[in-house]
Amino acid sequence: MKTLAFAGSKGVAALGMLAIAAVLSRVFDKVDYATYRQTLLVYQFVGPLLGLGLPAALFYFLPGETSRLRSVLLENLILLGTLGGLFSLFLALGGNRLIALQFSNPELEETLLIFALYPVLFLPTTAVSAVLVVQGKVKWLLLHTLATRLARVGLVVGAAWFCAAGPAGAVGATTISGIIVLSSGLFLMLRAVPREKGSRPTLTGMSSQLKYAVPIGLALMLEKLAMGVDQVLVSMLCSREDFAVFSNGAMEIPFIQMITVPATAIVLPELVALYKSNDKKEALLLWRKAARKVAVVLLPIGGVLFVIAPELMTVLYSEDYENSAGPLRVYLLLLPARLVFFAAIFQAASRTDLILKRAVGTLVLNIVVSYPLVSYMGFQGAAWGTVIVFWGYVFPYCLCHCSRLLETRWFKLMPYRQVGIILLLIAAAGALAALARAYLALSSAFLEGAATATMMLILLLPPLALLFWKDLSGYWQAIQKRLSGKEQGPPAGC
């Protein structure tokens, strides 16, 4: 249940962002919409760096602690609040003008000043998931995420749609929603963690958390920066209209983490146990089995989205954003490499240094490859740059090191044959559905997309059920075990 709540909260957050994007794409013109998205991009890009891995450190410091639980939490929140406050000061004292100049968008000067309070409000709330999961309050986490995201959607949509407040109003509503998130988060965290007599936050405790969090959090920070550099490059090198189109297509598909996070968390404890007992053959079999189960669920969904991408972008964001289908389709090419988190093997082998090295290489290469591609191809180049780096560096890097850790050959690490069969089925179903769609006289993008998706699923589901029924049923049974509470430890990381 912990894992599903963790994944579910991420899915709810992603759906909330999707709802806001869908409304603002229709209410604002592309220039105003780009201003809103660029304002949020500043925190989305810098936020992981500011956090220093401190929220994840609570998974280590809270379990087993009896005498200083509340103090450990307060030390973590003080550090997060201080780091968020420093960035808020940076924005308020001239950083807004500097960023507006780099993005060639003078309107950012006003919106970033309005947004300046947001980092100090929101950064402490990044600890909510860790605290509530460790303390066994998973229902609280889901309710908190659902309520605060609904509040944010209501505030932003109300400001933009009903009040016609423009991007400054939408950003102001986002900042106000930060107060709601902080209030709810602090209330729940303090309720979940009991107070002790005679125990207070100390500088020594803060220092201990920093020493633990920074090395582990550094890899996570760099990987998030690496995967977000595409939007920064498009903001700097392309027009605001192009950034608006790109940002909608470059969205994180909500279902990806909702599928892969539970699957990885199901596998990770057993994978660690097998690795520690030096049973690497069984660990490899477990790994391949998990990859097959996720592939049967994830790849068909991605295939359907690939085929109906233009209709999906039109339905979500209006006809003005039909070209957002280009970046979406390019990023969907990453799905076969994201069937599982390779970091699970690195964690099982206690080789987090490999995650850090991968992150550094990904960040540097993404900048080096994407910059000229964006200059030459426009915003499409950013998507292709990320895909080239992922398939040309990240995937081979993971295959090489994971095969060594499991003492096998790279071509035995993944279920390539099964993945290939699924991709062939998707390609055949997609081609037939696209051919049939050409003969349908449907005037609505929604009807056209729905009809195409339905045809693809009708063509896909029977052969998938016939060939991979065991994997599908096994995946469902594993999730049912999680729902029954038979799990240990925190949710798996990336």
Per-region residue spans from a language model:
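N-terminal membrane topogenesis motif
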Residues: 1-17, 70, 74, 108, ...
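Membrane-interface junctions at transmembrane-helix termini in multi-pass inner-membrane proteins
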Residues: 61, 121-144, 332-361, 372
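Hydrophobic alpha-helical transmembrane segments
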Residues: 109, 113, 142-192, 212, ...
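Helix-loop junctions and terminal segments of transmembrane helices
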Residues: 17, 22, 50-66, 133-134, ...
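Interhelical loop/hinge segments that connect adjacent transmembrane helices in multipass membrane
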Residues: 139, 167-171, 185-227, 266, ...
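Membrane-proximal transmembrane or re-entrant/amphipathic helices at the cytosolic face
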Residues: 409, 432-494
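Interfacial/gating helices of multi-pass transporter permease domains
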Residues: 23-45, 109-110, 167-171, 205-216, ...
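Signature of the first transmembrane helix
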Residues: 1-56, 83-88, 92-93, 153, ...
